[in-house]
Design a protein with these regions (language model features):
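Early-domain small/polar-rich strand-loop-helix modules and first-structured segments
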Residues: 1-88, 145, 153-165, 198-207
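A short acidic Gly-Thr/Ser loop motif
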Residues: 4-5, 12-18, 174-190, 194-197
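Short, low-complexity, polybasic intrinsically disordered segments
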Residues: 134-148
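Phosphate/ATP-binding catalytic cores across multiple sugar-kinase/actin-like superfamilies
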Residues: 104-116, 163-170
Length: 220
């Protein structure tokens, strides 16, 4: 499904609070992250859906959060957790599986790059989550059809693998030595450290992760 030989990729960084969407084509130097507001550098999209009562129209992200303050809207958050728990959500006389609503949210954010003039179809969708489990990998591949793609177009990775790809696609001088990355989520800071073992052939790359909270530092 290449576009004149220029492969087109969409990436979604996902946790239970927000999503971030980026796109990349081979004529670009690096991926570009998109916002729901043109010209804004606020890239975190709240993982929230809202539905107007009796009409059935869905809103997502910041707009859903804002409109949910009205008594006319029903708001659903924690979609990732609810989907993994196979929750059923009842709104008025309608019932939805949380996995179905998570897929609806993902479809909406997947459309953001096309609003910037990019193709509406893409070659690969990469979803990045905190950790890979049998349950979340199975769920995402199971919802591929709902997302309008086939399973061969989908890749699910965790943050360690994402960090690995990011680091080794930088200038070589940046990863000749150890590479570290800090990531903040609410009151916690994640510390990732990438190391290369130069004594082995081929070289072995290892990534360690520490979680720093207000109380202690532990491995997540």
């Amino acid at each position: 499904m290449g576009h004149n030989g220029n492969s087109y990729y969409i990436g979604i960084d996902l946790n239970d609070s927000y999503a971030m969407v980026s796109f990349f084509q081979q004529n670009m130097k690096e991926p570009e992250t998109v916002s729901t507001v043109a010209g804004s550098e606020e890239f975190q999209i709240p993982l929230v859906l809202a539905r107007r009562k009796s009409i059935g129209k869905w809103y997502y992200g910041d707009e859903a959060r804002r409109l949910s303050k009205s008594g006319e809207m029903v708001c659903i958050d924690q979609l990732l957790k609810r989907a993994l728990n196979s929750e059923k959500i009842v709104i008025d006389d309608d019932s939805f599986m949380a996995e179905e609503l998570l897929a609806l949210f993902l479809k909406k954010v997947m459309e953001l790059p096309s609003k910037l003039g990019n193709p509406s179809s893409f070659d690969r969708l990469v979803i990045c989550v905190d950790r890979l489990t049998k349950e979340n990998v199975s769920m995402f591949y199971g919802m591929a059809v709902r997302l309008g793609i086939n399973s061969r177009q989908l890749t699910v990775i965790d943050r360690k693998e994402s960090f690995y790809y990011f680091a080794l696609n930088q200038d070589k001088s940046l990863w000749l030595h150890d590479v570290v990355m800090f990531m903040q989520e609410k009151e916690s800071i994640f510390f990732y450290s990438l190391k290369r073992d130069l004594r082995t052939t081929p070289q072995v790359v290892s990534i360690d992760c520490l979680l720093y909270t207000s109380d202690a530092a532990d491995e997540p």
